[in-house]
């Protein structure tokens, strides 16, 4: 599998529950680069780049979330790899 870019919006109880840190830990473990960012509407935007296989595994973690989170929806699309990140950050 080649390189790809994931763009996802995660809905539910995902702010103030450690969701971004949880996402960051799993992204780094899977070798992904990008970011997780709280949005004003209560969702979390996630952009991650890396190998497609790792991105597919990562999607499972987005659905699961940390213990205090309650994920109700993950809207995502795979895009062309851009190689613009050097780490995985949270905002």
From Swiss-Prot:
Enzyme Commission number(s)? 3.6.1.7
**Catalysed reactions, semicolon-separated:** an acyl phosphate + H2O = a carboxylate + phosphate + H(+)
Give the positions the UniProt entry annotates as the active site: 20, 38
The answer to keyword Hydrolase applying to this record is: yes
The broad enzyme category this protein falls into is: hydrolase
Please name the GO terms that the record assigns under molecular function: acylphosphatase activity
Pfam families per the record? Acylphosphatase
- InterPro entries from the UniProt entry: Acylphosphatase (IPR020456), Acylphosphatase-like_dom (IPR001792), Acylphosphatase-like_dom_sf (IPR036046), Acylphosphatase_CS (IPR017968)
Which keywords accompany this UniProt record?
Hydrolase
Which residue range or ranges hold the Acylphosphatase-like domain? 5-91
Show the NCBIfam families listed in the entry: PRK14440.1 (NF011012)
Recorded family membership = Belongs to the acylphosphatase family.
Identify this protein by name: Acylphosphatase
Species this protein is from: Metallosphaera sedula (strain ATCC 51363 / DSM 5348 / JCM 9185 / NBRC 15509 / TH2)
